[in-house]
Structures are given as structure tokens and as C-alpha cells.
Design a protein with these regions (language model features):
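Extracellular polysaccharide-degrading/modifying enzymes targeting complex plant/algal/animal polysaccharides
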Residues: 1-193
Length: 193
């Protein structure tokens, strides 16, 4: 099948659905008091009696960033990658108020690939935090031989970023979807209303 645009047209093929019913303001204590009045909240759309669960959100044609520890593209270096224990150790200073974040994920850069791992637990031990992950991704991450994260490499250890927690919603253009309710939180950019 070949799809072509008519002359001077700019078609968009999308499986996206509009999120409507936005309300400004949020009283969730996981968001800092200073930001609560800036956050917009909406219920996710439903299809076939199921709430739409999404990993991407677009606002006015621009991809919004899932709530993250750092701005898009910024990452921190891990301390250890332990296949026997199936853990990754990171600086405890990167944990902040996240030990109880229910939907927290870790993005791990490992050579030419990335892994997105759902965090199961965080054990803070002094200046280090040992992180365990849910299955099946824990087994997949630690059992496959290549590419695993680099520890002690010429250019340093592999990098990571923590994402997908309401506690991380702190920058304009970030969003978060709460499960199982499906509630979507969005911190608009300055040019958005």
C-alpha cells in the first residue's frame, strides 16, 4: 500500500486520542505546594470499557516529556550493575523522595540500546541506593549477554534516569499518568494555556 499526500498537504497518521476535560490545580501531596496550582489534571479517555494507558503524550504537535528526574537527554552515571543479585546501584543523592513511588521506572543507557525497567524496590545504604526491578524485565536485563551496561569503562559507567513518578513532575512540558485510575497530570509550558 502506498499513501501519498495531495499537493501542498501535510497529513498526519495518528492513533492518538484527545484528552479532554482538563482542570487546573491539583492537591496531591506528592507535588510540591508551589506547583500544585500550575498542574492540569484530566481523566484518561476510555475505549471498550478500558482506560487508555499511554507512554506518550503530545501537546499542540509537540511531544511532552514523561515526568523525569532530569531534563530530556540528561542522565546520571550508575555505580554498579550486578547480574547475580539483579540490582543496579546508583548514588543515593539521586533518590530524593522516590522510595515509595509506585510506578517509578529507570531508563538505562547501555551502549547502543536502552532498557526501560519498572522499579520494584529501592534500598538506600548510606551514599548508595540499590534498586531491584519487576519481572519480566529484571530477568531480561540481567540474563542477556549483550549489550549490558558498562561499569569501569574508558568513558565511565553507563548512565540512567529515573522517570514516571508524580513526585518527578516538576518541569514545564512534563506529564504523568496514574494507574489504575488513569488520571493524567500535565505541567504546561509557558506558551500553553
Amino acid at each position: 500500500t502506498l499513501i501519498r499526500a495531495v499537493e501542498n498537504a501535510h497529513p498526519v497518521i495518528s492513533g492518538g486520542v484527545a484528552v479532554t476535560g482538563w482542570k487546573k490545580g491539583c492537591d496531591d501531596p506528592r507535588i510540591t505546594k508551589e506547583l500544585r496550582s500550575k498542574i492540569w489534571v484530566a481523566k484518561a479517555p476510555s475505549f471498550g470499557n478500558r482506560i487508555v494507558e499511554t507512554r506518550q503524550m503530545w501537546v499542540d504537535g509537540n511531544k511532552a516529556q514523561r515526568a523525569a528526574q532530569f531534563p530530556d537527554g540528561v542522565m546520571e552515571r550508575m555505580i554498579d550493575f550486578n547480574p547475580e543479585e539483579q540490582t543496579i546501584t546508583i548514588p543515593a543523592s539521586q533518590i530524593g523522595n522516590l522510595p515509595n513511588a509506585r510506578q517509578l521506572e529507570m531508563i538505562v543507557h547501555q551502549r547502543w540500546a536502552i532498557a526501560i525497567l519498572r522499579v520494584k524496590s529501592i534500598d538506600v545504604r548510606g551514599e548508595q541506593a540499590v534498586i531491584r526491578f519487576h519481572e519480566p524485565e529484571s530477568h531480561l536485563e540481567f540474563a542477556h549477554p549483550w549489550p549490558q551496561p558498562v561499569i569501569g569503562g574508558e568513558k565511565g559507567n553507563s548512565s540512567f534516569c529515573l522517570t514516571n513518578a508524580l513526585e518527578l513532575l516538576d518541569q514545564p512540558g512534563e506529564w504523568f499518568q496514574e494507574y489504575p485510575s488513569g488520571t493524567i497530570y500535565y505541567y504546561p509550558r509557558s506558551e500553553e494555556d
